[in-house]
Amino acid sequence: MHIMEGFLPVEHAIGWSVASAPVVAYGLYSINKKIKKNPEQRMLLGVAAAFTFVLSALKMPSVTGSCSHPTGTGLGAILFGPSAVAPIGAVVLLFQALLLAHGGLTTLGANIFSMAIVGPFAAAAVFRLARAARFPFGVGVFLAASLGDLLTYVTTACQLAFAFPDPVGGFTASLAKFAGVFALTQIPLAISEGLLTVVVMNALLRFNREELGSLNIEGNGQEVQA
C-alpha cells in the first residue's frame, strides 16, 4: 500500500495531502477530547498505535511503486472511532517513511488517505452494520478489520489508476490491473489481519475490560468468537 517516494505526479501528491489534512486535524481534536474525558484510555490508544505500526511495517513486494502488507487500523477504528485513527496512521506512516524507507514524504498524503482515512472509516462502518445486524461480536470485528484492509488497497489501486491510466482502457483498465495484482497478496493478508484483530480484541476484553467499558464497545465482557 505504501506508494513509494516520488512515484506520484506532483499535482496528485498535493491533492491527496490537501484531502487528508483536515481529517487528520479533526482526528487530533477527537483524540484530545477522548483522553481528557477518560485519561485511562491512553494505554489502549498506545496499543492501537503499536498494532498499526507493527502490522503495516510487514511489507512484501506487489504493484510497481507500492507494496502489500496488513494495515492494523481496524482495531483502532473499532475502539476509538475512525477519525482518531487518522493522526495515528499519519504518525505511523511518517515514521515508516523516515526510518524504514516505506512509502515517502511526497506520497505521505496519498498513503494517509488510503490507510489512515478510508480503511478506518470503512472498518468502523462495517463494524456498526454488523452490530446492527446482530452478528456475533467477533464476526463484526473480523469483518471490520478484513474489509477495512481490503478497501485500503482498493483506494490505493484507484490512486495509482488515476495517476497512470491505461493508454487504451483509461482509468477502468488501469484499476483492474492494479487491483488484480494487489488481490493476489492482499486477500490472504486481509483474512489474516481479521483473525489477528479478533485475537487481540479477546486479549483486551480479558485484561482491560474496565477500560473497554468506557469506550462503549459492545463485547459485554465476552471473548470474541470468530
From Swiss-Prot:
InterPro entries: CbiM, CbiM/NikMN. It is found in: Cell inner membrane. GO terms for molecular function: cobalt ion transmembrane transporter activity. Its main location: membrane. One of its GO terms (cellular component) is ATP-binding cassette (ABC) transporter complex. Pathway: Cofactor biosynthesis; adenosylcobalamin biosynthesis. It is a multi-pass membrane protein. The chain crosses the membrane at residues 6-26, 43-63, 75-95, 107-127, 135-155, 181-201. It comes from the Bacteria. One of its GO terms (biological process) is cobalamin biosynthetic process. Keywords: Cell inner membrane, Cell membrane, Cobalamin biosynthesis, Cobalt, Cobalt transport, Ion transport, Membrane, Transmembrane, Transmembrane helix, Transport. Belongs to the CbiM family. Part of the energy-coupling factor (ECF) transporter complex CbiMNOQ involved in cobalt import. Forms an energy-coupling factor (ECF) transporter complex composed of an ATP-binding protein (A component, CbiO), a transmembrane protein (T component, CbiQ) and 2 possible substrate-capture proteins (S components, CbiM and CbiN) of unknown stoichimetry. PANTHER family: COBALT TRANSPORT PROTEIN CBIM, PTHR43627. This is Cobalt transport protein CbiM 2. The gene is cbiM2.
